[in-house]
């Protein structure tokens, strides 16, 4: 008798587990995306990307997840599409159990702005270019003159990193002018004088020597 009861209980338990598994599987398949939540990090300091920008990109690519089945939403495709925006440094898209797609976005950090006949763009802290925004102007050194993009992402990029790490010269230098022969002039924030740097070769040693001279 006890054995029969045990068999019946085990059978019922097995049936219950199968039913629950099937029920929740069907429920997950039927669940649709209820909301798209976007977090743009450092949005108070930088305004290159907004939530509406990202939503517009997804709609144009037919990737807007709202009201779509959660199982049909490909977060990798969403990330790939949004990374085409040159203002974005990193993005993570993921699903939540409550039927929400969340986007966490990091904007690029500009360290230099170039205005020349070759273009008007920023150089970011990773050494890549990014377009100028119509809604936000970054407070970074301005480069003008004869600036090729190759120079911008190599020598000028290294020089901008140096300025970021050197408080004295970062406070001094406001503009950089590049001549056709790649000779460089630095324009200070205060005064009418210019610093003739020459080429970017050994620029740190040149500026160290100049600072030593100014301190005499």
Indicate where each model-derived feature is located:
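Short, surface-exposed charged micro-motifs
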Residues: 92, 175, 185
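Extracytoplasmic segments of membrane-associated envelope/inner-membrane machinery
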Residues: 104-180, 195
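Short secondary-structure junctions
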Residues: 66, 83-89, 164-172
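Periplasmic/extracytosolic POTRA-like scaffold domains at the N-termini of outer-membrane
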Residues: 43-84, 134-161, 198-200, 204-208, ...
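N-terminal membrane-targeting segments
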Residues: 1-69
